Amino acid sequence: MVRELYENAVRGIDTRQNLSALRSAVKDDAGMNDLFELVEDDLGTMTGFLDSDDPKVRKNAALLMGELDMSDFVQPLVNGYRKESQLFVRSAYLEALKGYDIEEYLPFFKGRVKELSDTEITPENRKHIDEEMKALTELIVSCEGISRHEFKGFKRFEADTEGILITNRLNMDTTRQQLEECGVKVLPFKGGVRFSTDNLTFLRDIRTYSDVLFVIPGCRTCEFEPEKAAAMLAGSGLMKLLYRLHGGENGQPFYFRVELKSTLDMEKKGKFVRRFSGELERQSKRMLINSASDYEIELRLIENKEHKLNILLKLYTIEDERFSYFVKHIAASIKPVNSALLVELAKEYMVSDAQVLDPFCGVGTMLIERQKAVKANTSYGLDISAEAVAGARLNTEAAGQIVHYINRDFFTFEHEYLFDEIFTDMPFAVNDKVTLELDNIYRRFFTCANRHLTMEGRIIMYSRNPQMAVKYSKNAGYRILKRIVISEKNNAELMIFEHEV
């Protein structure tokens, strides 16, 4: 099939259609190998398509030359780009050149960026200039990377910075309280924990938030139109905020990506983002450059109930080392931030210097987070998965802690002394067959817990099957001290038990 399509294109038989079909035919390795064999001894025929009078032939040929990954095509592609008169074709040459060594041509491509920046934008050329500028940026970045800014915001400033901590929606008060204890002003907000402060050092210490988004001064809400949104953002305090948090202005642009959260379908979202990004580059005089592959900041555009946009800033320049120990994980691993939340919620029921057991330890996250908040005497982790236990050992070493991990089933585990606490993330299931097995696990769990816990000991459990825990804990002689809903969607609760008196 590849040979027939190629030979027909060479003979001038439906050249445009055959080259287009070739692009589809070479998406798998076999098709690509067939085309490579046809072209490698006759490069001139392929490059000859770039001289066609049909712009779509030139476009398809350029893209095929990029996919073939033959270094001999670099010069013809650059020459083709230089002389290409059709705006909609120009970005195809640039796309084709990605992956090739184009270092010697960088001055030329950077000069072209300057030319496009100075070009008057009209409704007719806007789309194609934006496409070419985006392709040029990606090509240049793929060759030399970006000049990254260093976050220097962990210190006291004269002006306040406002932001939002993203945390568990049902337990936001836990994070609010920690902020207040750090002396940070907490502001009313429903979608997270909003703060205003002149010192961001608390971001390194509070462990119960998953993300931080910054409020952009002068740009809280804007019209849901790409050009208007870009103009408002460019005229806001965004650049001042970025400079303040990164040690001042150094002449280097910030590279950004856009995340649009909206009811628009994917096609309309993509169109909006492209128009917004291109306009923002122009309005900011390319001190903000859109890059899908390598970026430092994210502009998060969120459609609100009034069909306008709230714009927030996410910084990838912040090195979040709170969970740097989490180097190994498995599919069922609980996220460290969730473990940290469970610990914070249960902390008042934990005892310092306790003997602690996690019978379903996974990669050790629960025990590691507990130790960070409330020091244990000795901690043991059990799991039937050898892979999980190996991961737990690596994570615990990375955390600078000591935990005794054993690749063993909790229900056959024996130990010479009793534990003060069982702290665990219980197994869970998503289908009825495994649910029957889970019922048996919960029944056996509480029976075995009686063998391993002191009479004053407590069970602190994260469960997606709280009804099973209620049933079998009562049968085994436990009473519930506390239940905290973590996720209504997943029926997940933090549950704390102790022996009936």
Predicted regions and their residues:
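Short secondary-structure junctions
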Residues: 283-286, 477
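Short coil/turn motifs at beta-sheet boundaries
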Residues: 158, 251, 292-294, 490
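Residues at or immediately flanking beta-strands
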Residues: 255, 298, 402-404
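Non-catalytic nucleic-acid substrate-recognition regions in nucleic-acid-modifying enzymes
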Residues: 98, 114-126, 130-283
